[in-house]
Amino acid sequence: LVVVHIATRTKVAELDLGGQPDSVAVSKDGRYAAVVIENERDESVNGGAIPQLPAGRLAIIDLVGAPAAWTRRDVALTGLAALYGTDPEPEYVSINEDNIAVVTLQENNHLALVDLATGKVSGHFSAGSVTLTDVDLTDERPNLVQFNQTQADRLREPDGVTWVSKTRFATANEGDLNGGSRGFTVFNTDGSVAFDVGMDLEYRLARIGHTNDRRNDAKGNEPENVAFGRF
């Protein structure tokens, strides 16, 4: 982890993370940084199948004192997911006002909640699946978009995530291994689904001519990240 002084554009500190980081979030009160250590799988090994150790984890950085004095705590995420539980591949992290981090485990199709103060997993659950109807799953030549097929039990496999309140967060369901649901979902912290956009993103892209038929037999629009704001 490299710490940079923005005003002077100089590096002021480094902290060894002991693995391959993917994303980072800083708590609103400035007490913690949460760094996802994905230890990403090698897609050229065994066809990209997992498990491929070492397992991923979450690193909590305690932002106490000068950056050179910051310390790291590691939170194990193994044994949580029903899919490939020995090899969690955390992807993205977001922190709410109570300093609870939500972490996506994309290839595991799982979500974990971590209390940054205690460094403990306070909850976790599967991201679940959806059945997509009136979807185009065919790569035609010449390009032709036809929303007339069904894709049953498609794993969401979320990538980006953001809190939308203290008790709800939204995920961008890109898919990376066997899933991807072409949209986004709003979850409650108990794992229940408050809202799922279904095929609406795909239809809106088609209406404005931004549908690439070559992607229809794969993961469609592949939403990778999500942000939240009030206007």
Predicted regions span which residues?
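Beta-propeller blade signature
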Residues: 1-9, 51-65, 119, 181-191
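Short, conserved, GDST-rich strand-edge loop motifs in beta-rich repeat architectures
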Residues: 36-56, 171-182
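Surface-exposed loop and turn segments in beta-propeller and other repeat-based domains
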Residues: 64-88, 123-152, 192-219
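C-terminal substrate/ligand-recognition segments
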Residues: 215-231
